């Protein structure tokens, strides 16, 4: 069982079924001090054991048929991963430096649409082998829909993959093309704008610290002047 000195925390983890159902989750290597996974203070006592735990936790979370259990396991796993050194981060500071005088490389962005845990593990493993610099994991609005990967799942799976491969440091996760659908916007601007705002909030709550707002679909090429063509784009983005 996951070890905790807090009885409420132990009860919370037992309610998830971790200690009884998932034999990989054993040993005195994690301490959880509160019953709320999102606010728990997690102490890693055996990093090697935690790395081995990731496969089991991700499988349990992704394939659980209970929505609450899935969410709780994703939150718990994400917090464990952060305590193990995989830190969700914003790439804004690096981009600011690139815009000034730090040149000579690009930042690859990778959209994973399936087998996300396995593919992310491969990416981290190869990045460490070649001593790669920054790279981003992305998922677009459309991909969230047809792959059924909500932001919390995507972030958690990527962070768990980082821990599993022994990666420590910033992990960049981006909402790619959080795009307004033109026909939806023309039909009901407030509803479509509200949907994108809600998706952005969900992504930030899941610790996406990079958001690509895409309202280029609203460009009106029937206008004679370029600025007026682009006005719906830049005004809605703002």
Regions found by a protein language model. Name each.
Residues 179-238:
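Helix-rich catalytic cores of soluble enzyme domains
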Residues 1-174, 182-192, 208:
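Alpha/beta catalytic barrel-like cores
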């Amino acid at each position: 069982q996951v070890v905790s000195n807090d009885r409420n925390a132990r009860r919370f983890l037992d309610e998830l079924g971790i200690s009884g159902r998932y034999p990989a989750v054993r040993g005195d290597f994690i301490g959880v001090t509160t019953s709320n996974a999102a606010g728990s203070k997690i102490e890693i006592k055996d990093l090697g054991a935690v790395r081995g735990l990731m496969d089991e936790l991700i499988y349990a979370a992704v394939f659980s048929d209970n929505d609450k259990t899935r969410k709780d396991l994703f939150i718990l796993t994400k917090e464990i991963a952060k305590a193990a050194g995989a830190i969700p981060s914003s790439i804004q500071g690096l981009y600011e430096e690139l815009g000034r005088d730090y040149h000579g490389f690009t930042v690859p962005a990778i959209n994973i649409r399936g087998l996300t845990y396995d593919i992310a593990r491969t990416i981290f493993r190869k990045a460490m082998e070649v001593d790669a610099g920054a790279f981003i994991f992305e998922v677009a609005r459309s991909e969230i829909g047809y792959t059924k990967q909500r932001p919390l799942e995507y972030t958690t799976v990527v962070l768990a993959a980082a821990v599993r491969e022994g990666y420590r440091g910033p992990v960049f996760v981006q909402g790619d093309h959080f795009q307004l659908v033109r026909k939806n916007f023309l039909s009901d601007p407030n509803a479509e704008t509200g949907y994108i705002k809600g998706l952005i909030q969900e992504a930030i709550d899941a610790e996406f610290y990079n958001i690509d707002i895409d309202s280029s679909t609203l460009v009106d090429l029937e206008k004679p002047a370029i600025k007026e063509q682009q006005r719906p784009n830049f005004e809605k983005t703002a």
